[in-house]
Amino acid sequence: MAKGQTNAIIGGGEGIPTSVCTNIVVKAGNGQATLTWTDPPASETVHGVDIVWKSTSVRYKANSAPTSATDGTLAVTEMTRNQYSSNALTITGLTNGTTYYISVYPKSESGAVNADATQIVSVKPSDYSTWTVNIDQSNSNPLSCCTYADSATGMTKGSSDWDDIFGYKPCIMKDGVVQGYLNPNDFTKYENGSSAPITDTTYDVMIEFPRRGLSITTSGNIITVKLTNDPDNSNFQYYAHKRGSTQKDYFYLGAYDATGSSSKLGSNSGKTPLTNVSITNFINYAHNRGTGYEIMGFYQWTYVQALYVLKYGNLNSQSAVGMGYVGGSSAQSTGATNSSGMCYGSTSTTSRVKLFGLEDLWGNVYQFICGLYSDSSRNLLTTTDNFGVSTSSSSWEFSVSSGVSSDSGGYMTKAQGTNNGGFVLKVANGSSTTYFSDYACLNASRFPAVGGYWRDGDAAGVFYCFVNYSASDAYSYVGSRLMFL
């Protein structure tokens, strides 16, 4: 019997079925599943007998596979060959949380059915979704290189619908406890309209990011970024929402560049960003705020970058959102965008930018981030806990090769594109209007600062990551951002 044939057949004629259906792909949805497959050839010869494809039936069953082409529930009998090879069949009326087994049965003109077990797939519908953006790094156009897939298919780039999916919210925090949520269009007020203490250094203005799963993978030139609202999916990582072995429902980032002093790092409106402080001391000053406080971490920064590229589908963040304060001469006070909504920007180089409630995510001052170190071989050492400035690999949770053999910098054309490497530089050969459109560098034995500062012009943006600082470097143009995890 030829490969792909089976004794599990029904029907008359010569009793020889077609070959199997291939490329069977099933995807779960909310109370439904979608299925694509490739039918057997229209005609084929097996043992000297001409076999002609007639139809393909799809049957499904809860908790166990259909045992024959008459068992289970009939979803469809396809009479047009390859009708569902690219346009998926949708099976509705399924129960979320129940595993369904779906069998595909091709039938020949003689009536023989191929019931080979390789044509069985399983799926568990749920009310969780997966949103995907594919980044083609061989396409220099920062907008057209990003295409949507899965639940993102058909969504509009830049739409506010994405904000509902991400679920982030501005809030007032004190000692690690949310005191209340802010009006997203006016940070000076709580949701109920009462005044919020955004200038009071006893409190901090933070942005709350609820738990979502993230996956960043690369195949060839394609970086695939996936986000799910499933809080526990083994196909995703939750590094931004964990501290060591402890899983977190939320992480919080300062709405502003970090303010305060050596007594306590803060996040308040109407203040001058704290600068001229080393990454070592910034981490210490955050710790002085209390248990759970840090400066923004690498995995949280990566998470925000992923949300950006999902929402805007454009690698040029200064074009998609705004230039940011990149044409000035000194650091500007916080709170300029309090009444500018959650995402704001303009073409002016002396205006401010705001992404997901985070003012000056690029421009104004650089932000040191913790949780990432490039060692002497440019391996990327990362962690979700015990943030510090140790240069010993044993002090870090993960170590991955960057693939970068010498110190490198320039406009980024290729990123690491992995769960542990995020969007750190891999190849720099672009410009301010092509590929990732931001400047980046990766040097040995260095810590990172991100975003860009007041004189960076079109080099700044959400993918600006400058891994070029020692543990003791301190400059007037480098600050940080508070985090609670």
Short names for language-model regions:
Residues 1-25, 474, 481-485:
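Enriched but not universal
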Residues 10-52, 96, 112-127:
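Pro/Thr/Ser/Gly-rich low-complexity, intrinsically disordered linker/stalk tracts
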Residues 33, 127-208, 214-216, 293:
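GGW-centered surface loops in extracellular recognition modules
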Residues 40-73:
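Solvent-exposed loop/turn segments flanking beta-strands in beta-repeat/beta-sandwich domains
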Residues 84-90:
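Short S/T/G- and acidic-enriched coil/turn segments that sit immediately N-terminal to beta-strands
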Residues 91-114:
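Beta-strand-rich modules
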Residues 131-133, 299-302, 323-338, 344-345, ...:
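C-terminal, surface-exposed recognition/capping segments
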Residues 196, 200-203, 230-361:
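Short aromatic-cysteine micro-motif
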